[in-house]
Amino acid sequence: KKDGYIVDSNGCAPECFPTNXGC
């Protein structure tokens, strides 16, 4: 998860998809 992003129920920001790298 990246601080400062709205996250989904998994704690990942939409901007992280599809690779989730930043989560």
Swiss-Prot record:
Task: Specify the LCN-type CS-alpha/beta domain's residue ranges.
Answer: 2-23
Give the source's domain of life in one word. Answer: Eukaryota
Q: What processing steps or modifications follow its translation?
A: Contains 4 disulfide bonds.
Iron as UniProt keyword: no
Keyword tRNA processing part of the UniProt annotation: no
The similarity comment for this entry is: Belongs to the long (4 C-C) scorpion toxin superfamily. Sodium channel inhibitor family. Beta subfamily.
Q: What is this protein called?
A: Toxin Acra2
Species of the source: Androctonus crassicauda
